[in-house]
Amino acid sequence: MEASKIRLTVPEGIDPSRVLGAGDGVLRALENLVRAHVVARGDGIAVSGDPDEVELVARFFEHAFREAAAGRTLSADDVSRCLAVLRDGEHDASSLRDDVLLSYRGRVIRPKTLGQKRYVDAIRSHTITFGLGPAGTGKTYLAMALAVAALKRHEVGRLVLTRPVVEAGENLGFLPGTLEEKIDPYMRPLYDALFDMMDRERTDELMERGVIEIAPLAYMRGRTLSDAFVVLDEAQNTTPEQMKMFLTRLGFNSKFVITGDLSQRDLVGRRDGLADVERILGRVDDVAFSHLERADVVRHALVGRIVEAYDAYDDAREQRARDRKESR
């Protein structure tokens, strides 16, 4: 295939450094992610290489020009997310920026990948949503941001955040301290996320009034959760019985989000409640399953590589096991 060449010009009035990033960081990140050569001199940007990739780069810079015109500067981390959106057939990557879930103390929480955007859209349009994927994909954080936003808009009367408390083979009865002290370490990730989104004093006040509840999954038994946004975290550590119990707590004007990662199961020798739930509920109306992938990991670039390395290790181990079985 014959190489393609184009020349782009940074629009008048836009500082090229806003487009290319500090120290040309955006430019370097871009070249590492596309099959094209990109050279910037002054206000000119020359792009050459695979025709499809050249077109992709042109669309990327159209997005970068719009961001710069609005006073925003892309970071090197933004490049891979933007390219992923454009490669997926979207014509404009700004849909992620425009979808603000929550603003707190000048910090904006929004989906950062197309997978996250689809997950958020699924939560908005379904009563029950399962968010499945590896660590760092924002499953719980985005769900909690939507929950807090719903509470602030008075769409629901309370938030309920829950997770199984028996993990890593530990039995709470054998741990020292009061029940609250035993439970607190398991709930801490939920507290941390909540304090990222709301004033701590206000959060404490709402918790005292029962408007926000953070409790172990076992505390959901026998209840009907109405007028509530409920998030069940670490669902891979539920049993099938616990999962059924939780799902049947649904009341009127409520929304349930269940998050989990099947690669991080702590249940030993037992089947978890997340393993078969898509086969059971996959065709039930108003229930959505959103699968987040490694491309949706946004914590730190290294987290994505760690997840990828573990997946490769697990795949290789499974292949060796199959080979041994076939050789017998």
Question: For the regions a protein language model found, what residue spans apply to each?
Answer:
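Intrinsically disordered, low-complexity linkers and terminal tails enriched in Pro/Gly
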Residues: 83-99, 315-328
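Short, surface-exposed acidic/glycine-rich loop or hinge patches that mediate macromolecular interfaces
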Residues: 13, 51-52, 237, 297
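Short amphipathic alpha-helix segments
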Residues: 15-32
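Conserved helicase motor core of SF1/SF2 NTP-dependent helicases
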Residues: 44, 104-116, 120-232, 236-328
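Hydrophobic side chains in well-ordered alpha-helices
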Residues: 19, 57-60, 243-246
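Interdomain "pre-motor" coupling segment immediately N-terminal to P-loop NTPase/helicase cores
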Residues: 39-96
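A short, structured beta-strand/loop element
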Residues: 32-39
